[in-house]
Every structure is written in C-alpha cells, then in structure tokens.
Amino acid sequence: METLANRLDVCQDKILELYEKDSDKLEDQIMHWQLMRLEQALLYKARECGLTHIGHQVVPPLSVTKAKARSAIEVHVSLQQLQHSAHAQDPWTLRDTSREMWDTVPKKCWKKRGLTVEVRYDGDENKAMCYVQWREIIVQNYTDDNWVKVAGLVSHEGLYYMHEGQKTFYVKFKDDARVYGDTGTWDVHVGGKVIHHDSFDPVSSTREIPAPGPLYACTTQAPTQAQVGASEGPEQKRQRLETVYGEQQQQQQQQQQQQQHTQTPAPQTTERARQPLDTDRTRDRDTTCPHPIGHRSDPDCVPVIHLRGDPNCLKCFRYRLNKGKNKLYSRTSSTWRWSCESENQCAYVTIWYTSYGQREAFLSTVKVPPGIQVILGHMSMFT
C-alpha cells in the first residue's frame, strides 16, 4: 500500500509541475494527459484493494475513477494522433487541450481563436444570446483519420464549417429562436457587422393565434374566419379584418334603420335614448361587438381586448406580457369580474392599445394560451 501511495504522490507532483510550467508545446500536453490516465488507474486500484483514503486524499468510487480514466484515454489518444499531423508544431496550451474544449461544440475536435457572436432574437437587446465562432477548427478526416484545419464561418442560419465538401452546422439559431424569441426572427451581430433577417416564412413561425373561444360575439362566422387567419400574413390579416368590420358595420346600420322605421318615439324620448350612447358605461358593455371602425372618429375612444378565462391563468399570462411584451400595448388592467355574476368563476383582464395597428400587431405576435377567450372592443380613454 505504501508503494501505491508513493507512486500516486509522484504522479500528482509531475502534474503540478506541468501546471506551473504552463507550456504551449503539444508534447507537454500529451504528457499531462498520460499522467491523468495514470492517476485514475492508481486510484482505481486503491479502491479495488479496499482503500477509501490515501493519506488525506479521498479515494473515489470505482465508477467515478473508471469514467475519468476513459475520458483521459480519449483525449490522450486524440492528442497522440494530432502529433503526427501538420499542426503538431502549433502552440497548444492546457486550455486548448482541456476536456472542456474537447466537449465544446463542435464536439470531438479542437478549436482555437474564438470570436463572440451576439444574436438578438426579435431584434431586442434584452433577448440577446452570445455564441462562440471558432475561426480555427481542427477536425479529423473521414477517410485517412488525418487532422486538418478548417475555418469556422457564420451566417444568418447559424455557425458552421466546411469539411470535405460538406457544410456542418454546430449551432442553429432557429432552434434557440423558439426558446428565446417570439416572432421567429433574429439579427446576428459579429465583428461590427449585422446580418439581418432577410427572409421570414410565416408558415414556419412558432407563434400562432389560437381561437379557443369566439373572437367576435356579434356574428357566428367570425370564429371560423379568425381560425383561418391564424396562418395568414399580417397584411392579409389586416385586410381581412377590415372587410369583416365593414360588413358588420353595414349589417348594424341596416338593423338600426329598420328599428327607426318600426318605432316612432316622441322627440324627447328619442333624445333621452341617444344620450347614453356617449357614456363610458355603454362603451364598456359594447366591447363584445367588434365594430371599432365606426368609432375611429371619436378621439376619446381607444381599441381594447378583453381576456376572459380562469383568474390564475389570466394573472400568469398578464405577468408574462409585462415581462416581455410591454411594447405591444399601452396598459393592462387588474383581474376583474362582473358583480352580477357571482356564480361564474371566469374573470377578465382588459388590455389597452394606442392604435388599431398596435392591437393587430399584438394579436399577430402574441400567442394566447388555450382556455383564454379574446374579445375585441373599444373603450373611452381615461387616466
């Protein structure tokens, strides 16, 4: 046992000497990993003999030393093969030949001269992610197992390199756009240059507008049209909405004319009946009827949507909006209910917009969770 402890001490002393030497030669890095293999082999043997401590050092379990030994063997053999290539005389430091560098994407190869690439999802600085573009990537050929150096490249699609006529991506920004972004667009900032999103296919977007409930309460065809519009582009959707609004406005005007012909109230009664139409209360209750075009001439009227659903779902959705979507609307209300509907468990959240274009941009960008009903409307503006 003393011989095993002495051999372990000598091995670890040599490892410390290499750390202090801080060499940039490949031979020293190969020696370092050879000593790492020897250290794990000695610890494995000590554990097999029933030792849990060697001096003040704890002997790891067999599974731990076995895994570390395999890792050291993999890197050691790779560096030995690299020594027979044309890049053996290049500077190689402990950092360049570390296990962490070996496992960093692209994996199972050696990388040098990293350059930071910043990707801003949705064009927002708050949603920026940083990646590393390796300008020198040493990969192994598929045919002769020889190590060759290729250049790391960047495009709007991701980070990649060309090897043996094949383009190999090791980072695709599209995958992270589903996690960090909302619109499926991003800008790449590298070396003082910006690569913009020049082609966006709305079909491949990860954001859609579900229609769990009727978006328009005044007609029976509007929910079906809203569902079909989820796959349309913003310009087509805007034109379709304006067409629906115009048809609904004409229907409402015809109904009002028929009511005026069938009912002939006295002048005073007619004047009294018209006065409540300009009150805030009537506008609040009229938000279920989507005819905002008829109110665009009123400077005190603003577009809104009412979200109806479970109170907890509404609170969570409002919290997410305040964190990442606050530029798409003016303000949001607290969770509220109608006092006359005590048995109804549904609640409401009202969202205000500065313009109808902002509301359309919100609906085409934000994905409303299932179970929350969206009701378009308009309200009098107050502060």
Swiss-Prot record:
Residues 271-288 have a biased composition (Basic and acidic residues). Phosphorylated. Residues 301-383 are annotated as: DNA-binding domain. Keywords: Activator, DNA replication, DNA-binding, Early protein, Host nucleus, Phosphoprotein, Repressor, Transcription, Transcription regulation. Residues 218-228, 261-270 have a biased composition (Polar residues). Residues 248-260 have a biased composition (Low complexity). Transmembrane segments: none annotated. Its main location: host cell. InterPro entries: E2/EBNA1_C_sf (IPR035975), Nucleotide-bd_a/b_plait_sf (IPR012677), Papillomavirus_E2_C (IPR000427), PPV_E2_N (IPR001866), Reg_prot_E2 (IPR033668), Regulatory_protein_E2_N (IPR036050), Regulatory_protein_E2_N_1 (IPR042503), Regulatory_protein_E2_N_2 (IPR042504). One of its GO terms (cellular component) is host cell nucleus. One of its GO terms (biological process) is DNA-templated transcription. HAMAP family: PPV_E2 (MF_04001). Binds DNA as homodimer. Interacts with protein E1; this interaction greatly increases E1 DNA-binding activity. Interacts with protein L1; this interaction enhances E2-dependent replication and transcription activation. Interacts with protein L2; this interaction inhibits E2 transcriptional activity but not DNA replication function E2. Interacts with protein E7; this interaction inhibits E7 oncogenic activity. Interacts with host TAF1; this interaction modulates E2-dependent transcriptional regulation. Interacts with host BRD4; this interaction mediates E2 transcriptional activation function. Belongs to the papillomaviridae E2 protein family. This is Regulatory protein E2. It comes from Human papillomavirus 3. The gene is E2.
